Amino acid sequence: MFGAITKTYYAEKMGLDPKNIVCVSVMPCTAKKFEIGRKDQNAAGVPDVDIAITTRELARLIKRTGLDFTGLPEENFDDPLGESTGAAVIFGATGGVMEAALRTAVETLTGEELAKVDFEDVRGTDGIKEATYNVAGMDVKVAVASGLRNAKELLDKVNAGETNYHFIEIMGCPGGCVNGGGQPQVSADVRNFTDVRAARAKVLYDNDAKKAIRKSHENPSIQKL
């Protein structure tokens, strides 16, 4: 999404030729290396993202150059497109995309500000989670599948007519992007005694709670679009 906006909206705003913009994405997912080469990922007639590196590869580059973040001066993120919300932060955890969407959907449908933005029913690393929310007099049924095995189980039930939902979130990696193939590897000594997926997800939710803006549609950069 960022790559597409960079090559279209940002290029137009800055008077740049999309061909002269190089977009590098740092991702927890190794599949992104394949996705950037897909023919449908070219909103401006050129690849939306030119280079995809994993978080583990970025860490190696940082160590290789000897970069010390503690010695760098504080700076604001670039503008435009430098602002983010709590909803964006939680995308990396299973259920995060669902929760971010619900925050916006509920306010859009009801026309009222949410008294509580946390949808905790869809959080957690369980294989399949279901929840029903009454929104503007309508029962909205949602489901979240963590990992492809659970996704198949959920979709088989839907295809068989056993259940139905208004919105389904599927995370290919169990626990979500925090458990992606490109993430820093954890030793067996740690994995055997610590739920790394849950620990990483907790950091995201903690960061979300500290954000001044926690809903996607309230991001000033998005509103300008």
Language-model regions, residue ranges each:
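Iron-sulfur-associated redox domains of electron-transfer enzymes in respiratory
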Residues: 1-225
